[in-house]
């Protein structure tokens, strides 16, 4: 069967740079501009349609509608606005200067570790450079130096940000202006791994030596409600919110990133089916191998002989959760799987001290060790 290729889109950073370039051109030429061509960081030339054009002698504004392609991006369809305001610079030998700020709907950085200074608008370095260079380029043909003030805004950015991990990363009040290539790859693992790296950078900058890596929000909440300390549930110093990092299905990447960034201790948190996949050696737990995982689990339980808490035949089991429930949450059974998950994780990142927390489907802690 032929499947239609997924369509790529463009980052908020590329859209912001295009809008700023369009506004700058309107301000310089004092006429409406319908479209601008932007050169992305890897050299690709892309045309962006402009909307909402307004201008007078001192300022101009417009917006680009974010197109994320076939990626399920919450910012798809968002209006990325830019306003460029100018002041004459009456100094001999002076050069045109560009200052970029965030307006309504663009978040503010409140925690270290993100590559953007605390207190600054959440506009990442590559988009910041694209915006600055694009505006300067438009005014490079003007003899009189200018001071140009660029404001990037997203009208519904604060509401959209609630659907992202921005608050956890310490970005408050709106969205981030992101992108290193200008292109959004559809359903890309890179979006997850970029967020993982950012969350770990924030955690390390905040002094966290113990990181809680969870496979999802449900299991993470179990760990939070259990009062995870640096030595486990209800023990030691309570961990700050920055220590909690959702790795999703990217266990291998997350563990190696922790090791690379100097993390010392990791608490791996997940529900039974995900921990079973880790125990079976999967670095990416989204893989469709449930049947093979259950076969491996059957072999492990066979080694227990008469002590096995799971009645046969195995052909009647369809899911890992069903097996756990049939065992009656047997402690020996849970320890078997969690120990193997911990050992598999340690093989992926030998420098880390790793412990495993099994989150029950009823939101309780079933195992820690």
Curated annotation (Swiss-Prot):
GO terms for biological process: anaerobic cobalamin biosynthetic process; methylation. Its EC number is 2.1.1.195. HAMAP family: CbiD. The keyword Nucleotide-binding does not apply. Pathway: Cofactor biosynthesis; adenosylcobalamin biosynthesis; cob(II)yrinate a,c-diamide from sirohydrochlorin (anaerobic route): step 6/10. Signal peptide: none annotated. It comes from the Bacteria. SUPFAM superfamilies: CbiD-like (SSF111342). Belongs to the CbiD family. GO terms for molecular function: cobalt-precorrin-5B C1-methyltransferase activity. This is Cobalt-precorrin-5B C(1)-methyltransferase. It catalyses: Co-precorrin-5B + S-adenosyl-L-methionine = Co-precorrin-6A + S-adenosyl-L-homocysteine. The keyword Lyase does not apply. Keywords: Cobalamin biosynthesis, Methyltransferase, S-adenosyl-L-methionine, Transferase. It is an enzyme of class 2 (transferase).
